[in-house]
Amino acid sequence: MDKISDAVSEALEKAFELAQSAKNPYVSENHFLKCLLENTESLFYLIIKDIHNNPKLLTSAVDEALSLEPSVIEGSAMPKPSPGLQSLLLDAKQEAKDLGDEYLSGDHVLLAFWKSNKEPFASWKKTVKISLDDLKKLIINIRRGNRMDSPSAENNLRGLEKYCKNLTLLAKEGKLDPVIGRDEEIRRTVQVLSRRTKNNPMLIGEPGVGKTAIAEGLALRIVQGDIPESLKGKQLYVLDMGALIAGAKYRGEFEERLKSVLKDVESVDGESILFIDEVHTLVGAGATDGAMDAANLLKPALARGTLHCIGATTLNEYQKYIEKDAALERRFQPIFVTEPSLEDAVFILRGLREKYEIFHGVRITEGALNAAVLLSYRYIPDRFLPDKAIDLIDEAASLIRMQIGSLPLPIDEKERELAALIVKQEAIKREKAPSYQEEAAAMQQSIEQLKEELAALRLRWDEEKKLITGLKEKKNSLENMKFSEEEAERVADYNRVAELRYSLIPALEEEIREDEEALNQRDNRLLQEEVDERLIAQVVANWTGIPIQKMLEGEAEKLLVLEESLEERVVGQPFAISAVSDSIRAARVGLSDPQRPLGVFLFLGPTGVGKTELAKALADLLFNKEEAMVRFDMTEYMEKHSVSKLIGSPPGYVGYEEGGSLSEALRRRPYSVVLFDEIEKADKEVFNILLQIFDEGILTDSKKRKVNCKNALFIMTSNIGSQELADYCAKKGSRVSKETVLSVVAPTLKKYFSPEFINRIDDILPFVPLNTEDIVKIVGIQMRRVAQRLLERRVTLTWDDSVILYLSEQGYDSSFGARPLKRLIQQKVVTLLSKALLKGDIKSDTSIELTMSKDVLLFKKIEG
């Protein structure tokens, strides 16, 4: 028998394997029946399931019959088909012939079983009380005019059920989230669906704005009956592309599956609507070696109006795939779905709040909803509302839920303290001296007291957990009751509606209110079950690295004394330190301009006066590590084409996919200090890029992605006018002001930088040449760093004033600033100490002092 469907052929093969493994000499019709029932995707199984909702009853009867089959002890010869199985297959072949089918399939086998009266099938058949004529009608209804003309034809029946999800059924079962707002878009979708031809809306919008939610909203309205007469009673299916492609082994199998779905939608005469999410994936799908792609299968049905279809795709994909295919584009009516306003996004979150509260078992405050929208809008610019705000609420709620299930911090601390005391007591008990025994007895009292405190805390924890868990269960019950009320109203069961609306629901709501009040009135609660704006800010900070949560007292104090902290590292530059500190304080309390970077500063001055050091010190203070500073040496950007290094190569060039060094650094770490060293050496094209960043806080990279630069601090350093500045300061001494210094360098500045560039800089900060006092302070800072490194080897280093004076005199050169000091300390001090350490002259746990003797550095050990 050569023309058998794939499903029947597979069942026959498995039947032979089953008989062989059970050592049965013959493959009976029961082996075959068992294997047919195991394939839950087969036509045979689907019809059995339609006849009787529980096919397991038949499976159990077949298993019992198989246990009575004879078996042979020796020999493993291949079992032969029994006369009963051969007769059954011949009958099935005749059924296929009668129905005009080319291939024998599962429905033919079922008809043959039905007529054979073989046990245990015959006994099961009596329980279902269905006639042969009714069975044939059911098969015709399932097949919907399809012929078995290929081995896989059987698999393509009921395409809608296999490869689609019924959204209206999910809405009826209450499994969809409520769709708030978007009334205009849903109304427009309904309007297009009501047309006679080309009734296919295409939802186009950015990812996360709510395109899929519009389809779900339509399904909810169909169930509620809030829909025009032309769409009442329709079924909305969403195409599952994964299921459609998965397991399509042979060429043309994917197209067959899609055709079966389209045929099912068309055969019900407009009663089904197909929703294709990410519709652009159909363009090109299945097209190999000149074959048609899946989109071409859609076109005829779309043009005729026999296929009701809703598509959804993003603006970029629509442009890239759909617009290129003019024939496909004109068969859809575009509906643009824009990002909701901040007010609408808050409104949407209010509608979803209850679902998330019930799922996580927490309370979400109004402030949390507002914070989620505002903070996501400001700090997560590369995603869209309401999706990003919903994600914030979801993550914050899951954080609280996780904390409820974990051990509270006070209990954890007490348990650690108790464990440490017990270990210490056990160690003391081993000592024989009476004083130790007394101490062990005293510790026992502390242990008992801690155990009592722990027991009380655990009792409180259990009570709070019980209250919170009970609240979650009651809220779940309330949601189920409200769904039951809606369902009863749909089927006009008004007695049930009245009972739920006026009795059960109000009583449960009152219980929930009482439980919430009882929970709120508890003092010193161990568990937090409220999602507030503080927690939302914490989640945003975790996502972006931008510290927008409320400042701790320690951080506030640190910001107030920022100048003092910076002056410990950068000496003699009060103008720059003061201006930068003010900018950071304004940004940290949220008073800086939200549409511009935190600060844009140009540091002017001769080499070695602390320009780069100040940028490093800022990064260290803000992020606790100097490496957090993103540094660009602008001598690498002197050619016109080098701008592509910053924002990425244009399309078609090597490195296009990698992105630019500046754009990628700011995308990964938006809150950072960006240093452009020696900015005057950069090409003019680089300055044009910086204009956009400094003015709007936005950088557009080579892929047209907008990178947020509003949380970065930009510092540029330059040596422009350093000679004029040095001459002026030498003439005037310490009596210079910032304004007078800038007036000296202004003419030189205008030669290098355009007026529009200078205009976008927040402040131009002159770094004046260092005087003798500054050099002495810098030597002290550098020496303390050497001493710090020695402390790691348990060596204490001190020095007298003569060492500082010698180093400051020998190491300072007004032309080179403080940089030669570092080299001198390396040559004179570090070299001397490293040789002494290698020789063993300096050992661990010693103190040494550096002194001068006839212009020679010496060290001596300090006894004691």
Swiss-Prot record:
The keyword Cell cycle does not apply. It is found in: Cytoplasm. Residues 158-339 are annotated as: NBD1. GO terms for molecular function: ATP binding; ATP hydrolysis activity. One of its GO terms (biological process) is cellular response to heat. Keywords: ATP-binding, Chaperone, Coiled coil, Cytoplasm, Nucleotide-binding, Repeat, Stress response. Residues 340-545 are annotated as: Linker. GO terms for cellular component: cytoplasm. The keyword Chloroplast does not apply. InterPro entries: AAA+_ATPase (IPR003593), ATPase_AAA_core (IPR003959), Clp_ATPase_C (IPR019489), Clp_N_dom_sf (IPR036628), Clp_R_dom (IPR004176), ClpA/B (IPR001270), ClpA/B_CS1 (IPR018368), ClpA/B_CS2 (IPR028299). Its main location: cytoplasm. ATP 2 binds at G605, P606, T607, G608, V609, G610, K611, T612. Residues 555-769 are annotated as: NBD2. Residues 4-69 are annotated as: Repeat 1. Residues 1-145 form the Clp R domain. Residues 81-145 are annotated as: Repeat 2. It comes from the Bacteria. Residues 390-524 form a coiled coil. Belongs to the ClpA/ClpB family. The Clp repeat (R) domain probably functions as a substrate-discriminating domain, recruiting aggregated proteins to the ClpB hexamer and/or stabilizing bound proteins. The NBD2 domain is responsible for oligomerization, whereas the NBD1 domain stabilizes the hexamer probably in an ATP-dependent manner. The movement of the coiled-coil domain is essential for ClpB ability to rescue proteins from an aggregated state, probably by pulling apart large aggregated proteins, which are bound between the coiled-coils motifs of adjacent ClpB subunits in the functional hexamer. Part of a stress-induced multi-chaperone system, it is involved in the recovery of the cell from heat-induced damage, in cooperation with DnaK, DnaJ and GrpE. Acts before DnaK, in the processing of protein aggregates. Protein binding stimulates the ATPase activity; ATP hydrolysis unfolds the denatured protein aggregates, which probably helps expose new hydrophobic binding sites on the surface of ClpB-bound aggregates, contributing to the solubilization and refolding of denatured protein aggregates by DnaK. This is Chaperone protein ClpB. The gene is clpB.
